[in-house]
Design a protein with these regions (language model features):
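Hydrophobic/aromatic residues within well-ordered alpha-helical segments
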Residues: 10, 53, 60, 64-68, ...
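N-terminal intrinsically disordered/low-complexity leader segments
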Residues: 1-9
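Short secondary-structure transition hinges
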Residues: 92-133, 141, 162
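Hydrophobic alpha-helical connector segments
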Residues: 59, 70-99, 153-157
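C-terminal peripheral helix-coil segments that are non-catalytic and often amphipathic
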Residues: 1, 88, 95, 130-144, ...
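Membrane-interface starts of transmembrane alpha-helices
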Residues: 146, 150-154
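Short coil/turn segments at alpha/beta junctions that flank glycine-rich nucleotide-binding fingerprints
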Residues: 24-28, 79, 100, 142
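Helix-turn-helix
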Residues: 13, 21-55, 59
Length: 188
């Protein structure tokens, strides 16, 4: 008989197994039965942790976004000056979106992870936009820039970062350079 596991450990195992199967087979073609078979557990155990396959999709999205938030938060250390925080934030955001896109790729181009990618990307864009808005408002208050509408500007910048980071051929340094130029031009 198998040893019982801690609830969080077991829940994480379900999330990891579902994530693996989604990447291999797509979300539509991955069933609850295939997830429990992957873990060699009873189907009822799945339903102890999740109401449905959609709950697992949401849990994976939450995991990705928790990682995304932690990555960009590291650059917002209040002991750093404004320019260091802005540059660090932009660099971490670009890398974090690339990582998120990498996580949202199936084993081949026919694998459809649209449900998961839409949820994850929208939440990540919202988080990054809110943080960038705060930074731009601070830059305006410090007279380091003059961005007329920080909220709209942030949404535009973050959407561009998210889109460009999703293309494997995109050079992350080039994305950062373009963003710096846009902020520099808009902030005059």
């Amino acid at each position: 008989m198998k040893e019982p596991k801690d609830n969080e450990v077991r829940r994480s195992e379900f999330i990891d197994a579902a994530e693996k199967l989604f990447r291999e087979n797509g979300i539509v073609d991955t069933t609850v039965n295939s997830i429990v078979k992957e873990l060699d557990v009873a189907k009822g155990l799945f339903y102890y942790y999740f109401k449905s396959k959609d709950d697992v999709i949401e849990a994976i999205s939450e995991k990705y976004n928790r990682d995304f938030k932690q990555a960009i938060q590291r650059s917002l250390d209040p002991s750093n000056d404004f320019e260091e925080r802005l540059n660090g934030f932009l660099e971490n955001t670009i890398v974090s979106f690339r990582t998120l896109w990498d996580n949202l790729q199936g084993k081949n181009e026919t694998i459809d992870l649209t449900i998961l990618s839409t949820r994850s990307l929208e939440e990540a864009k919202q988080t990054a936009s809110e943080k960038l808005t705060e930074l731009l408002k601070e830059g305006n208050e410090l007279k380091r820039m003059n961005i007329p509408n920080p909220e709209y500007f942030s949404k535009m910048i973050v959407s561009g970062i998210a889109d460009l980071a999703g293309h494997a051929e995109s050079d992350l340094r080039e994305i950062k350079k373009m963003i710096d130029e846009l902020i520099g031009k808009a902030g005059k």
